[in-house]
A protein has these predicted regions:
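Generic structural signal for short, solvent-exposed loop/turn connectors between secondary structure elements
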Residues: 16, 21-23, 92, 107, ...
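Bacterial Sec-dependent N-terminal signal peptides
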Residues: 1-25
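Active-site beta-strand/loop microenvironment that shapes enzyme catalytic pockets
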Residues: 91, 117-278
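Generic cytosolic/nucleocytoplasmic N-terminal low-complexity/intrinsically disordered segments
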Residues: 3-4, 18, 33, 47-48, ...
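Short, glycine/serine-rich, charged loops/turns that create anion-binding
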Residues: 13, 100-101, 208
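Zymogen propeptides
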Residues: 23-126, 204
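Solvent-exposed coil/turn segments that connect beta secondary-structure elements
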Residues: 65, 101, 198, 278-280
Length: 280
């Protein structure tokens, strides 16, 4: 009798755990709004409430076969930083996001490697950044957009495969496995880029501050299988701007632990390097 009770308790505990895991892994439901060919948008509730704002995740889904991607950088265009709407309006882009974090000592330079065709914004790989956004393929047999995992793919083997690169910190590796960040208690507004096993590209923005590890868990709860994700920017610099015939959407961050602990930012900041998207 005692054995049966122990067995029953163990069974129920295991069933509860499996049910909880299943719910966590598919807890985000997304309904896409088509903005233009190959570009979709959705605002969804994050699985966890934030300390500030609406706890929403703003997600752009992109079919890379139907759009063109561009790196636009101040170092290539008049040495002048611009807001996301200014970048979009000047260069005719439907979507603009940060291309990565910039170097605080060289404010026009990406912190990691960045190249756009013959223009090198930063020619040096950042040692601890294991992710690389790549697009504008040199060979038509290559995918139009990739997130390369430099911990699994040697840089020398892929550095001439594409014409446009931007290096950043990995959040999920090429096998879909989460990475743990050491800054466990740092909260910030956040922008990141992800790709799924079908090749769709996702830009994910949150005005509400979360830790990096919380955001990684949110990515794993998406209803698509992510095979790579990179952190792009946080705080008031984090920018997402969408301007299509059907809709205009403006998203900018605010909160960063210790350096900007408020939700008061009410405008886009000027940023030096962006990724632009326009329909072919």
């Amino acid at each position: 009798m005692q054995f049966n009770k122990i067995y029953l308790f163990t069974f129920l505990l295991l069933a509860s755990f499996c049910r909880s895991f299943s719910q966590d892994s598919t807890c985000i439901t997304i309904t896409w709004d088509s903005l233009s060919p190959g570009i979709f948008f959705s605002d969804v509730d994050a699985p966890k409430k934030s300390i500030l704002n609406d706890s929403k995740l703003s997600i752009v889904k992109i079919d890379p076969t139907k759009v063109e991607f561009s790196i636009l950088s101040a170092s290539e265009h008049e040495n002048k930083s611009r807001t996301a709407p200014e970048w979009a309006n000047e260069f005719g882009m439907s979507v603009i996001i940060n291309a990565g974090m910039y170097d605080l000592n060289k404010t026009l330079s990406n912190k990691g490697f960045m190249q756009n065709f013959n223009h090198l914004n930063n020619p040096t790989l950042y040692p601890s950044y294991g992710g690389m956004i790549a697009f504008n393929p040199a060979d038509t047999t290559l995918n139009n957009f990739e997130i390369l995992d430099l911990e699994h793919t040697p840089w020398d083997s892929v550095k001439t495969c594409y014409y446009s690169y931007s290096q950043g910190m990995r959040m999920i590796d090429c096998n879909g496995s989460p990475l743990t960040w050491n800054k466990k208690n740092q909260l910030c507004s956040m922008l990141l880029c992800a790709i799924d096993k079908e090749g769709f590209v996702y830009y994910i923005f949150s005005r509400s501050p979360y830790t990096h590890n919380e955001m990684i868990r949110f990515l794993l709860a998406m209803p698509f299988e992510i095979t790579g994700a990179i952190y792009l920017e946080g705080g008031p610099e984090a920018s997402m701007y969408i301007n299509t015939p059907n809709k205009k959407i403006e998203k900018y961050g605010s909160y960063v632990s210790r350096s900007y602990e408020n939700d008061k930012n009410d405008h886009f900041w000027k940023i030096p390097n962006v990724i632009g998207v326009k329909t072919k």
